Amino acid sequence: MALTDIRSDAASGWIPWTAAERENFFSAIARHNRAAWRVTLASAVAIAFTSAIVATLMAPLFYAAIALAFDLVNLIVPAPNLVQLLGDAIGPAIDHPEAVAPARWLQLALCAALPGLVWMALVVLALRRMLLASALFGPGPIARPCNPSALEEQRLANVVAEMAVAANLPAPRVEVTDQAILNGVIFGRDERDAKVLVSQALLARLSREELQGVAGHLVGSIANGDMAIGLRASVALSLFALVARMAAIFPNDAIGRHVWVLWHAILVPTSSRARQLALELGDPFGESNSDSTSAPAGQPRSGLNAQKSQGNWRTLLWLPLAGPIVITGFFAGLVNLFVLSPLVSLAWRQRKYMADATAVRLTRDPDALAHALEKMSGAGAPLTPWTAHLSVIQTGGNRSGPLGASVVPMFPSLDRRLRALAKLGAHVSHPPRRMPLPLVLILAALFAVVGVLIALVLYLLVILSTALTMLFTGLPFGVLHLLLRWLGH
């Protein structure tokens, strides 16, 4: 849909909307904000629920490690038998579940999930530190400061400063990239260290009014707190991607070395390690970048996802982790892909609408952003993977980072964004249409069926994980526990 074909003139036959058909930008911003926070709340509930399940599934591993630590201490000085204490605590619930009060069940569930939740909280903090240390959350070497002697670049700096004044924000630092792309993006943790990056090609193509629309969208995203919200969403999704990555590298005879490399990248987030791990977390089951490098003849590859080799006695030593890690990892990966990422993407689509409406509020010119979006359409190219969601338009072909790997696009289509701008006064030919009621009912029924199937699959995964935990974790731990207690007497 070309905007040049839908101008407001007699020849085009375009009929301006009436006042009743239009929507002021304050109402649009409030409406999209409510929708975004509703989906965000659903995403937070889903993430919390999934975190509790993942933490509970990993509980046997944590309690086994703690109990074995008590058993080792018991070899030197008397120490409590944690297995016996746990048996006394959960024995009545297993023997007579109908007699257990709901509060007691809640207490047992909290005790089961507590070690895993503490572990996940520590990992979240480490992942956030790693992502901030990674070059993927900054413009990197592709950016350079604006050249004051270049007219187009100085115009960009002036326009961004104008939009910042209109939004009552400190002026963000403005940078330019010489890459052959037609896009703009923001970087930073919050409004205090925000950066705006626009391509030189876009500066040459847009008029000053259209550049104001793009700057209004980017500054509007800063004002709406999209950088901090995007970082929190990325950290939450990368947590489940990390669990999935651990499951993906598990059946390997060098699992110990790979796990050490992975955790060292988190705990010591040097630039190269953090960047490598951040790239891998965008596709937790894919082949790591380090795998693609050729190895010498006869030598195994050394990446985090090195080629699977024949099992040996060292692999068998890791079998007690099969239940808690492998099944939990695939559980986290599936839920991340089909539940959490789509919910986050739906919320982010509303935030893009809200940034567009904020741009109209700052510029008072809905046509400016609409014309700019039309010129940018289909011209997106990757700027940086983990900040693709902070760009003006969808970066073509870029699926890196948890926010870019969803089955639901995180950006509305160009047509939908133009129709939303039309309600704010932009000159487009067709007003947005409501979805027909029969189609709404069909989609609602389809989502209900999918929800039931997902719940059933999750239940079966929990049962399967419990069985594998009892087989691979409980049995060897029980034998080792009895042996250590016998030696301690």
Q: Would you name each region that the model predicts?
A:
Residues P139-A157, L340-R361, S406-P409:
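Active-site metal-coordination segments of metallo-dependent hydrolases
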Residues D9-A11, I15-W17, L125-V235, L281, ...:
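Peri-catalytic and regulatory segments of divalent metal-dependent proteins
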Residues T18-V45, L202-L237, W263, Q276-W313, ...:
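Membrane-interface, cytosolic juxtamembrane amphipathic helix immediately N-terminal to a transmembrane helix
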Residues A2-A11, V165-K195, W260-L316, F338-W348, ...:
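Active-site-proximal gating segments in proteases and membrane effectors
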Residues G91-G138, P148, E152, A161-A167, ...:
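Transmembrane alpha-helices and immediately adjacent membrane-cytoplasm interface residues
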Residues N224, A228-A357, I454, L458-T473:
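Hydrophobic transmembrane alpha-helical segments that form the core helix bundle
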Residues T56-I76, A93-L117, H264, A306-G333, ...:
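Hydrophobic alpha-helical transmembrane segments
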